[in-house]
Curated annotation (Swiss-Prot):
Protein name in the entry: Aconitate hydratase, cytoplasmic
CDD domains referenced in this protein's UniProt entry, alphabetically: AcnA_IRP, AcnA_IRP_Swivel
Pathway: Carbohydrate metabolism; glyoxylate and dicarboxylate metabolism
Listed cofactors: [4Fe-4S] cluster
Cofactor note: Binds 1 [4Fe-4S] cluster per subunit.
Source organism per UniProt: Cucurbita maxima
Length: 898
């Protein structure tokens, strides 16, 4: 069991200038170990955490040594424990987390223990930002109208979260309409350095959203984890992680005139994807750092999941301190942060000579080489230089269906869909823009690109250009500060004139909450099989995510979103072709509306002020009248309503006893689905709209829910019945068992029937037959969606055999008791001749002590084939989870024993 901290003699006082002390801290220099000076800054944060939390039980002295010896130990894939300083949630992932906590309290109660042991031990911040939809756009009243609809749809969920904020200690809930979680985290919640009862330590955070990495731009170590892992971290469990390699990314030079931070991040994303950084930290350094504003850094850090890294880390320097002052942190706080980080060798001062850090590998980018670009049409790392966009688009129309292809026959490529839009003649072609959204924390946190977009709108208005009325335009800032500086600059009216009215403060289009297109537009697209485009300043553009009818989705900077909205198509060469005709009848080109870097800098300087941040965040937890009027039950145990279609008691702990179920293999399982590469968590557990013919729709209709009130899958994650039916329900699912047919169906192997995935799974379960899933590379990439593991578990899936897994998803599968297995290098289902019509036996020992992390096992089929796979339990702790039937039963049993 836990002992006292062996490093207590390293506890040192941090003096205040002018007398007194800021507090005590665990001093890295007092260890007198020269290896620490060579460590990357990101690894120093892990080291400090290990020293501070060392109790020779959860965190051992040898763990500290592994981190100090990072240079030698990181290539060996060693495991370390990490205890983050706090946990961050948003409402889509927060609702199921609070449901699980409430359910764990019930389980503790039933097992005769104290249910109040289930309480967050670290600060938990939950920001409600994922529920607002763009129902109303292009209207002065859009914010209010969308918020009223948001509350009508989500009243029950919001009341449940409000109950949670009262029932659990240490939990702050930021009400709807306040902003996007990662931007609120950057501008307000991020501490950089904690001072808890006189103990100083670096802020660090894990969040149930993959873009938690945005906070890395502020020098705070943070990354996305599954909801299941986050719940364990809240309850004081150390997170088990492999000590990561760190890629050193050197930046030099400065961005050319007219090039944006978004162009830079799309370039960095492509470079890092190519380099291969999955499971690694990326740490930025070099002279170019001084040219990047903190918002630019946050934009790059935000997209870590898109380049595949665990973190994209920017150590704290003078730029960070300036930003902390700008965003209203007090002078006293900023001086404590600087003093602590300097004293503990965690501050970078570019005015001083830099000691060489050691990195696992190195990359370099001269900022002057970055050129304007966008990414798409289906993946964030498929970057296209702006000057090549037209030719790339035509290649995409020609290419066979794939990440860069739509397979439109040559004779159909010039088709025009003519229709009437509210009485006025309108037309759509392949590439016509039907959604243009300035959205997402990635970019709305960055004043230079937001004000850049407003300047494009202003120039367009002055020249007489106008966005066509059938383009669904929207602006959804990540915090109220954006509204304040857009108004202060006098530029918001120009955005309004082009249809970019503010529609709400939340994720909106970036996560698929784009709302309906006008019926006439939808019909024109569907009836004529048009490949319509969405252009958004988001961070993800996977198929079917932004809107079911936009097959081409491009990520672009906010000013480019406005430019493409004005052009009305992505089928344009901005260098050579005019965007439109001005009021004088002359052609207007891209160069005529594009602002210079100097113009943007001037407006940023005069419009973005510290008071805006102070006044916005002083009132953030006060909520709004609709939030304040929500009535919630009191009591620390939740009263489940069996008729609720939003909040339902899940079955995870139904028959739980104090005895773990133990390890087990899989015998004679059928294949539920057979996939190729790049199956995302969006494919496994979609967040967007509930299709009218889906099993989830049938369930809701049977319970008296109108179609208009279905809401989204994301909003119903507190109901396991809906979510089990929504598992593998993505309309773009490609399952090899269906021989080329696209859609959320599968073949029930014993009968050969074609059924919905849910119906097939139920059939297997009622016959007592286990199932597995076959997959290709990058299985589970995308959002850190714990329902992508919970759902398959509820469907009876016992194992997933893939070429490779995305980091968060693999740990989520383990957390739910599903076995992740990898084919051997160079092998996959196709090369082994597996069709998915076989039965599979996985030969795993029944005794957990006989299983090692990463060991090989034999898989045999009833057709006589046998092959070797690697079991992806990566750590001893993960084996303990598996033995217990998952991470949450493990935590409950441990808490009862304490």
């Amino acid at each position: 069991m836990a002992a006292e901290n062996p490093f207590k003699e390293n506890l040192t006082s941090l003096p205040k200038p002018g007398g007194g002390e800021f507090g005590k801290y665990y001093s890295l220099p007092s260890l007198n170990d020269p290896r620490i000076d060579r460590l990357p800054y990101s690894i120093r944060i892990l080291l400090e955490s290990a020293i501070r939390n060392c109790d020779n039980f959860q965190v051992k002295k040898e763990d500290v040594e592994k981190i100090i010896d990072w240079e030698n130990s990181s290539p060996k894939q060693v495991e370390i424990p990490f205890k983050p300083a706090r946990v961050l949630l948003q409402d889509f992932t927060g609702v199921p987390a609070v449901v699980d906590l409430a359910c764990m309290r019930d389980a503790m109660n039933k097992l005769g223990s104290d249910s109040n042991k289930i309480n967050p031990l670290v600060p938990v911040d939950l920001v409600i930002d994922h529920s607002v939809q763009v129902d109303v756009a292009r209207s002065e009243n859009a914010v209010q109208a969308n918020m009223e609809l948001e509350f009508q749809r989500n009243k029950e969920r919001f009341a449940f979260l409000k109950w949670g904020s009262n029932a659990f200690q240490n939990m702050l809930v930021v009400p709807p309409g306040s902003g996007i979680v990662h931007q609120v985290n950057l501008e307000y919640l991020g501490r950089v350095v904690f001072n808890t009862s006189g103990l100083l330590y670096p802020d660090s955070v894990v969040g149930t959203d993959s873009h938690t990495t945005m906070i890395d731009g502020l020098g705070v170590a943070g990354w996305g984890v599954g909801g299941i892992e986050a719940e364990a971290a809240m309850l004081g469990q150390p997170m088990s992680m492999v000590l990561p390699g760190v890629v050193g990314f050197k930046l030099s030079g400065k961005l050319r005139n007219g090039v944006t931070a978004t162009d830079l991040v799309l370039t960095v994303t492509q470079m890092l994807r190519k380099h291969g950084v999955v499971g690694k930290f990326v740490e930025f350094y070099g002279d170019g750092m001084e040219e990047l504003s903190l918002a630019d850094r946050a934009t790059i850090a935000n997209m870590s999941p898109e380049y595949g890294a665990t973190m994209g880390f920017f150590p704290v320097d003078h730029v960070t301190l300036q930003y902390l002052k700008l965003t209203g942190r007090s002078d006293e706080t900023v001086s404590m942060i600087e003093a602590y980080l300097r004293a503990n060798k965690m501050f970078v001062d570019y005015k001083e000579p830099q000691q060489e850090k050691v990195y696992s590998s190195y990359l370099q980018l001269d900022l002057t080489d970055v050129e304007p670009c966008i990414s798409g049409p289906k993946r964030p790392h498929d970057r296209v230089p702006l000057k090549e966009m037209k030719s790339d688009w035509h290649a995409c129309l020609d290419n066979k269906v794939g990440f860069k292809g739509f397979a439109i026959p040559k004779e159909a490529q010039e088709n025009v869909a003519k229709f009437s839009f509210h009485g006025q003649p309108a037309e759509l072609k392949h590439g016509s823009v039907v959604i243009a959204a300035i959205t997402s924390c990635t970019n709305t946190s960055n004043p230079s690109v937001m004000l850049g977009a407003a300047l494009v709108a202003k120039k367009a208005c002055e020249l007489g250009l106008q966005v066509k009325p059938w383009v669904k335009t929207s602006l959804a800032p990540g915090s109220g500060v954006v509204t304040k500086y857009l108004l202060k600059s006098g530029l918001q009216p120009y955005l309004n004139q082009q249809g970019f009215h503010i529609v709400g403060y939340g994720c909106t289009t970036c996560i698929g909450n784009s709302g309906d297109l006008d019926e006439s537009v939808s019909a024109a697209i569907s009836d004529n099989d048009i490949v319509a485009a969405a252009v958004l300043s988001g961070n993800r553009n996977f198929e079917g995510r932004v809107h079911p009818l936009t097959r081409a989705n491009y990520l672009a900077s906010p000013p480019l979103v406005v430019a493409y909205a004005l052009a009305g198509t992505v089928d344009i060469d901005f260098e050579k072709e005019p965007i439109g005709k001005g009021k004088d009848g002359k052609d207007v080109y891209f160069r005529d509306i594009w602002p210079s870097t100097e113009e943007i800098a001037e407006v940023v300087q005069s419009s973005v002020l510290p008071d805006m941040f102070k006044s916005t965040y002083e009132s953030i937890t006060k909520g709004n009248p609709m939030w304040n009027q929500l009535s919630v039950p009191s009591g620390t145990l939740y009263s489940w309503d069996p008729n609720s279609t939003y909040i339902h008691e899940p079955p995870y702990f139904k028959n739980m006893t104090m005895d773990p179920p133990g390890a087990h293999g899989v015998k004679d399982a059928y294949c539920l689905l057979n996939f190729g590469d790049s199956i995302t968590t969006d494919h496994i557990s979609p967040a967007g709209s509930i299709h009218k013919d889906s099993p989830a729709a049938k369930y809701l209709l049977e319970r008296g829910v109108d179609r208009k009130d279905f809401n989204s899958y994301g909003s119903r994650r507190g109901n396991d019945e809906v979510m089990a039916r929504g598992t593998f329900a993505n309309i773009r699912l490609v399952n090899k068992l269906l021989d080329g047919e696209v859609g959320p169906k599968t073949v029930h192997v014993p009968t050969g029937e074609k059924l919905s995935v849910f119906e097939a799974a139920e059939k297997y379960k009622s016959a007592g037959q286990d199932t597995i899933v076959l997959a290709g590379a990058e299985y589970g990439s995308g959002s850190s969606r714990d329902w992508a593991a919970k759902g398959p578990m509820l469907l009876g899936v016992k194992a997933v055999i893939a070429k490779s897994f995305e980091r968060i998803h693999r740990s989520n599968l383990v957390g739910m008791g599903i076995i992740p297995l990898c084919f051997k290098s160079g092998e996959d289902a196709d090369s082994l001749g597996l069709t998915g019509h076989e039965r599979y036996t996985i030969d795993l020992p029944d005794d957990i002590s006989k299983i090692r992390p990463g060991q090989d096992v034999t898989v045999t089929t009833d057709s006589g084939k046998s092959f070797t796979c690697t079991v992806r339990f990566d750590t001893e702790v993960e084996l303990a989870y598996f033995n217990n039937g998952g991470i949450l039963p493990y935590v409950i049993r441990n808490l009862i024993k304490q």
